[in-house]
Amino acid sequence: MVTLGTAGTASARKMMLLGGGELGKEVVIEAQRLGVEVIVVDRYENTPAMQVAHRSYVISMLDTAELRRVVETEKPDYIVPEIEAIATETLLELEKEGFNVVPTARATRLTMDREGIRRLAAEEVGLKTSPYKFADTKEEYLEAIKEIGIPCVIKPVMSSSGKGQSTVKSEADVDRAWDYSQSGGRTGEGRIIVESFVDFDYEITLLTVRHAGGTSYCAPIGHRQDDGDYRESWQPQPMSDAALANAQDYALRITDALGGRGLFGVELFIKGEEVIFSEVSPRPHDTGLVTVISQDLSEFALHVRAILGLPIPAIRQYGPAASSVILSNGKSEAPAFANVDKALEAADTKVLIFGKGECNGVRRLGVALALGEDVTDAKARAIRASSAVEIEY
């Protein structure tokens, strides 16, 4: 039996999100629908998730003393990491002391850097991955480039949403890619991974939910990226039954190895019926924003249900759907959004404005979502809606 309380009272179940971006915002909303009291922690004020939370704290989550202080102050029932830049050693200690880290402190630690999860997937679980080498210095990086070969992909071991990531297509890109990897990652200069370029037909995100009743999968999500940063996604990604079965097998094996309950975003390359593991995050995935319109239970609702121990008897898809991001390309400390009415003129269309208080150059500020007759139609509808929105700087 699962008993839920009432926020703001002695019966409240308390959830603390470590990180408060647009994905965390949707998690907060879903948790509050079930009476959960939500606290958001991030490194700056007025993040999207803070705008809908009961309370918030501004700290560096890499500061072990500060992280421990806010956890011990609030004594949450669930600690839910949402970003990479967290003192994971402190989470391991807190878990040993009885706090519930979602999905587990070990899973959080392994997936917060690409080295931990790549070694788990390739060396322990036995999943096929691209050839890779790690490097701490430019000399090691140049040696790794020689061994892996060109073309290759360069990523900081601690980053997300394409930050610090680039593709080396020729010798002319080598120095630039190193410099960007050291300036663009979540935690500044540091260790990187050099990956061989993978020959694939398409890439998917397979949202995988570990819950009280077992493991469930959403329909596969296809997506398009620019320099590692998501721009469009669609669901379902057409694929053969054999390829889907292989993808689900990979997702099951890696999420079982990580353990705990919650939603995982498993990224896979598909070549014919062959599957190559890319990455996994133990939390909602940006490409999964499409599920806000495509499914009866969005990825955020699934995550919250799994965390709370609630049943997930089925995941129903409404039909082909797509998302298209709303991007800034200017500087503002108070961006506004014009023509939202035009974006929403078509039926089966939604617009989410994330609530990011400032932009300086290219930044995701929102997303348009649409259902369609098929995936191609849904993508066209989503792009029309996102293109209709004009950002005022």
From Swiss-Prot:
It catalyses: N(1)-(5-phospho-beta-D-ribosyl)glycinamide + formate + ATP = N(2)-formyl-N(1)-(5-phospho-beta-D-ribosyl)glycinamide + ADP + phosphate + H(+). GO terms for molecular function: ATP binding; magnesium ion binding; phosphoribosylglycinamide formyltransferase 2 activity; phosphoribosylglycinamide formyltransferase activity. Residues 119-308 form the ATP-grasp domain. It comes from Maridesulfovibrio salexigens (strain ATCC 14822 / DSM 2638 / NCIMB 8403 / VKM B-1763). Keywords: ATP-binding, Ligase, Magnesium, Metal-binding, Nucleotide-binding, Purine biosynthesis. Mg(2+) binds at residues 267, 279. This is Formate-dependent phosphoribosylglycinamide formyltransferase. Pfam families: ATP-grasp (PF02222), PurT_C (PF21244), RS_preATP-grasp-like (PF22660). The lineage of its organism: Bacteria, Pseudomonadati, Thermodesulfobacteriota, Desulfovibrionia, Desulfovibrionales.
